[in-house]
């Protein structure tokens, strides 16, 4: 659920430390706390560990998921042209390769012809992206 009261809160935003904890657990690591999850993220190259409570954008989340996949030995060479999305110019240079991979793998498909890369990554987005990654 993620919250003490058992709620998932799908519309809540995803923070960096939440992402680090989930990805660390997915890798088989069992961090005892957020500080250990942060260190795991740094050690694996998923993140530089900055701004743990910072809210993630969709492109930031997908970039860290891409780095996670790479750190796990997943072939991340798939790519799709982003120019078919009306807001492709809004994709940050650091995130282009990751979003291209995520689009090619069906992890992200956009909505109404847009990727919304700068939009807030909700917990629902994270759950969908992670499901598609795990089952793709």
Per-range role (PLM):
Residues 106:
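Phosphate/pyrophosphate-binding loop motifs in nucleotide- or prenyl diphosphate-using proteins
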Residues 1-60, 65-95, 109-121, 132-136:
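Feature responds to low-complexity, polar/acidic, surface-exposed segments characteristic
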